[in-house]
């Protein structure tokens, strides 16, 4: 869980910016949104399969693009 130490000479805005940056780095908000509703295992697998396909197609595109430059 994100947490920061506020120094005595630090303004609220600076501390708030630090906290927001730490929350973004730890992906807290995205995880909370993902867990907001129950998702069956079949849906999770389906999303993983789709993302794996997208990743593979992206790699294939980059490889073909690289080969065409040789």
UniProtKB/Swiss-Prot annotation:
One of its GO terms (cellular component) is ribonucleoprotein complex. One of its GO terms (biological process) is translation. One of its GO terms (molecular function) is structural constituent of ribosome. Keywords: Ribonucleoprotein, Ribosomal protein. Pfam families: Ribosomal_S21 (PF01165). The keyword Manganese does not apply. InterPro entries: Ribosomal_bS21, Ribosomal_bS21_sf. The keyword Ribonucleoprotein applies. Belongs to the bacterial ribosomal protein bS21 family. This is Small ribosomal subunit protein bS21.
């Amino acid at each position: 869980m994100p947490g920061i130490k506020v120094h005595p000479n630090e303004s609220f805005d600076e501390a708030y910016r630090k906290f927001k940056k730490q929350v973004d780095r730890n992906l807290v908000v995205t995880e909370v949104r993902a867990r907001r509703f129950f998702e069956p295992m079949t849906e999770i697998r389906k999303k993983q399969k789709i993302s794996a396909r997208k990743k593979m197609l992206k790699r294939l595109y980059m490889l073909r693009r690289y080969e065409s430059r040789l």
